[in-house]
Amino acid sequence: MIFALHGRPFKEDNIPYVQHLLYYLQKKEIQFLINESFVDYLVQCNILLPSFFTTFTNKTDLGKPDLMLSIGGDGTLLESATFIGDQNIPLVGINTGRLGFLATTPREELEGSVDELISGSYKLSERTLIKLISDEKLFGDLNFAMNEFALTKRDSSSMITVHTYIDGEFLNSYWADGLLVSTPTGSTGYSLSCGGPLVHPKTENFIITPISPHNLNVRPMIVPDSCHISFEIEGRNQNFLISLDSRAEIVSSNIKLSVKKEDFKIQLVELKNYNYYKTLRSKLNWGLDARN
């Protein structure tokens, strides 16, 4: 089997776990394909690398491994998805980060998790992506996001107005710091911190969430992911910031922007002990009470 590995810098206490992961994968005779920048970081951490491995820097170099392991937190997993794109490579997150809604495999359970991956004892959860359409070639071939599309003011000056349309029909003019369109997967991310609802990843919806709206009557809205959402932007500053997950670009107010569901999905690995509702309870501390 061939495993691709991608990661970001992690805290020092994760070094023994990452070293053990590499050792155990070698023991199981797994072939390695490691992101080139991650190799450089592992060398800096004095982590002993496999005796033989190849590297990749982009989707073309990646080829077709059996699995991709994302070593980090949710942000690392979102970045890993950009290497996979439409190739249907199963993606699993080894959590060396903090919260871990998506990177759900604990570092303490590496051997058992690797055994499940090798034996194929896991399920795949198809995750919808959101695609950006614009009259400029923004983000190149990576014009999709697993969590959310964000349209925000560029600096800390006055708010912006985002005129929003669904399938050509006017929805609302949001006077706010910005606007989010999130996938169900992204409902536990930026949207949640802006007051958006939790939406199960198997539902076929998008969540439109204003960021700090001036009108307190404006609330998040759930719409079908079959719709086409377009925007017109106004503001004192003629430049604005748009982002797809953690990738951002500056655009002018005269640009035409819209989003819709991407044609392909990301295959997220769910191991035997994974439970979506348990993850919500543990990560959001549901049921905790100082009186207990």
From Swiss-Prot:
The alphabetical list of record keywords is: ATP-binding, Cytoplasm, Kinase, NAD, NADP, Nucleotide-binding, Transferase
Q: Name one Pfam family in it.
A: NAD_kinase_C
Superkingdom of this protein's organism: Bacteria
Q: Which GO terms describe its biological process?
A: NAD metabolic process; NADP biosynthetic process
Q: Which Gene3D superfamilies match?
A: Probable inorganic polyphosphate/atp-NAD kinase, domain 1, Probable inorganic polyphosphate/atp-NAD kinase, domain 2
Record's keyword annotation contains Kinase: yes
* Keyword Kinase part of the UniProt annotation: yes
- GO function terms (MF aspect): ATP binding; metal ion binding; NAD binding; NAD+ kinase activity
Please state the Enzyme Commission number of this protein.
2.7.1.23
Needed cofactors, names only, are: a divalent metal cation
**Which is a Gene Ontology cellular component entry for this protein?**
cytoplasm
Role description: Involved in the regulation of the intracellular balance of NAD and NADP, and is a key enzyme in the biosynthesis of NADP. Catalyzes specifically the phosphorylation on 2'-hydroxyl of the adenosine moiety of NAD to yield NADP.
Q: What name does this protein carry?
A: NAD kinase
Q: Which organism is it from?
A: Cytophaga hutchinsonii (strain ATCC 33406 / DSM 1761 / CIP 103989 / NBRC 15051 / NCIMB 9469 / D465)
Taxonomy of origin reads:
Bacteria, Pseudomonadati, Bacteroidota, Cytophagia, Cytophagales
